[in-house]
């Protein structure tokens, strides 16, 4: 029930975001005050009219759950921007299985070690062109980021490249490419671990050195 409820919640959040940046019906009907949304520093006017793949604005959500003394679950918050921490969960499970294996003998505990493969499948489903194995990259701010271990861990476990902004370029025909020793290679999907305000200095934070100029152009052209 918890799993189904969280999936339903994420679908609702995605539909809310899609409505905010497109029809804005929820604002017109005053379900949510328009002023509250449109004046929010987190509202991105650049995203108005966008249609992401499969209408999924948030493909990954880190929902914090708490349970009260009566055993009822409550959502503390939904981390939709750049959720972090899953690698520590996986590593913690591995350590627990080795140190306290008896905990797993008599309890039905769902596995978590398949997360990287499921993450890869989800990212691959978003590729704009059909390929047997889409070219996916994990975009990291770099080694000084507090979650860099996770960025490297997930890239390694998925078998994809870990890149920084300087490793990517936008071609003249508006495709994102990755610099390699053999020349530029087209990128199909970017799993970004960078807040959106640092993505493109021409569109968002002008002093950002973490990503690359024009990365928003392929997005605008649905590439």
Question: What function would you assign to each model-found segment?
Answer:
Residues 1-211:
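ATP-dependent carboxylate activation and anion-phosphoryl transfer catalytic cores
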Residues 213-214, 218-223:
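Single conserved hydrophobic/aromatic residue that forms the stacking wall/gate
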